[in-house]
């Protein structure tokens, strides 16, 4: 009996030991997965391959506009290729980063790298840019190119650094034309009573009042809806601007007044530009200028193409001859003096002289 009891106790102890071992095995945590070792040279390569800077470029026009196309197809491509990817360009359109004024303010503050903007909204920053708000200043694109790429354009560019800006290149917004939903406009008298959306610019407002309309300043992002709801009757812009924004869907009548030629400035934040090595600055400037020539070409080709498309879609295009534009020109002649009072008569006289040279 004693031996039997000892055997039972021994067997029980052995069973307990086995069970305890099994339980402990179940509780043992699994080993963590082995992480692949990142070699020091791989870390260094990743660091070297990361972009040195992301250049965000803002613009207010639509995605299919020639300016946006040129930014993507030329400027972005050239900068990224020439810098071996050290600089990456991101293009924003349709006022995604704010309108021209807000984008320019961001450049001055150093919170945005670049923007392509019309000169008209910038007169509050640099009054001399008002020379480009003189109605019927340039007879054609050739004259505009000569002025922007010559001494006047250089003089305007030299004013920018003191405002916290660097003008990389002159691009083209284009000749501004009238659209409206009410009637055909062939003579100034046809403008009477029409409510026309303009930019927030004193000289543009003065010109449209002089021609007999009721100008109403409004942000570009609000224009389509305002036209659709008949809050305003019409607007004025270069053809690529209003075609790519589908303005002709709510404004059937287009008159090629060509009352103002609007340049684009490709501006860069001086605060940010000053941190970029000289070699890379040169690449960025050269890319902006090459892309600018491409943009001008695209813009001019698009103007003719889009007017034809508008007619095919049922719109009415009134193409004014130089002779037919004269009554509009005569009514707005007083704006020359208004601009001279703001920027100085010497600058306006220099501008006239350069235009005369370009016409020869």
What kind of feature is each model-predicted range?
Residues 1-9:
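Bacterial N-terminal signal peptides that target proteins for export
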Residues 23-34, 46-143, 152, 160-360:
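N-terminal secretory/targeting leader peptides
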Residues 12-13:
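Repetitive helical segments and hydrophobic/amphipathic motifs
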């Amino acid at each position: 009996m004693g031996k039997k009891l000892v055997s039972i106790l021994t067997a029980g102890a052995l069973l307990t030991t086995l069970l305890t071992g099994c339980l402990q095995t179940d509780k043992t945590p699994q080993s963590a997965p082995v992480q692949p070792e990142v070699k020091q040279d791989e870390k260094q390569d990743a660091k070297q391959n990361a972009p040195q800077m992301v250049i965000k470029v803002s613009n207010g026009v639509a995605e299919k506009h020639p300016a946006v196309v040129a930014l993507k197809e030329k400027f972005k491509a050239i900068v990224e290729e020439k810098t071996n990817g050290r600089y990456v360009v991101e293009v924003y359109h349709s006022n995604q980063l704010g309108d021209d004024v807000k984008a320019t303010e961001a450049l001055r503050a150093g919170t945005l790298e670049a923007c392509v903007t019309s000169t008209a909204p910038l007169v509050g920053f640099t009054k001399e840019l008002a020379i480009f708000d003189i109605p019927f200043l340039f007879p054609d694109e050739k004259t505009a190119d000569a002025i922007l790429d010559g001494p006047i354009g250089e003089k305007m560019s030299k004013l920018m650094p003191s405002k916290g800006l660097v003008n990389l290149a002159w691009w083209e917004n284009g000749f501004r034309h009238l659209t409206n939903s009410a009637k055909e406009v062939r003579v100034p008298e046809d403008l009477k009573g029409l409510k026309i959306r303009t930019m927030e610019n004193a000289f543009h407002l003065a010109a449209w009042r002089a021609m007999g309309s009721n100008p109403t300043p409004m942000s570009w992002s609000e224009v389509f809806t305002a036209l659709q709801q008949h809050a305003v009757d019409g607007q004025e812009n270069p053809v690529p601007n209003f075609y790519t924004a589908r303005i002709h869907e709510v404004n059937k009548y287009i008159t090629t007044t060509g009352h103002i030629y609007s340049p684009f400035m490709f501006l860069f934040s001086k605060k940010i530009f000053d941190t970029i090595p000289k070699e890379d600055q040169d690449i960025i400037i050269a890319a902006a200028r090459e892309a600018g020539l491409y943009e001008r070409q695209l813009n001019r080709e698009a103007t003719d193409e889009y007017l034809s498309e508008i007619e095919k879609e049922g719109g009415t295009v009134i193409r004014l001859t130089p002779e037919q534009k004269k009554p509009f020109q005569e009514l707005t002649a007083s704006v020359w003096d208004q601009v001279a009072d703001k920027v100085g008569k010497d600058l306006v006289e220099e501008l006239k002289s350069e235009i005369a040279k370009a016409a020869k």
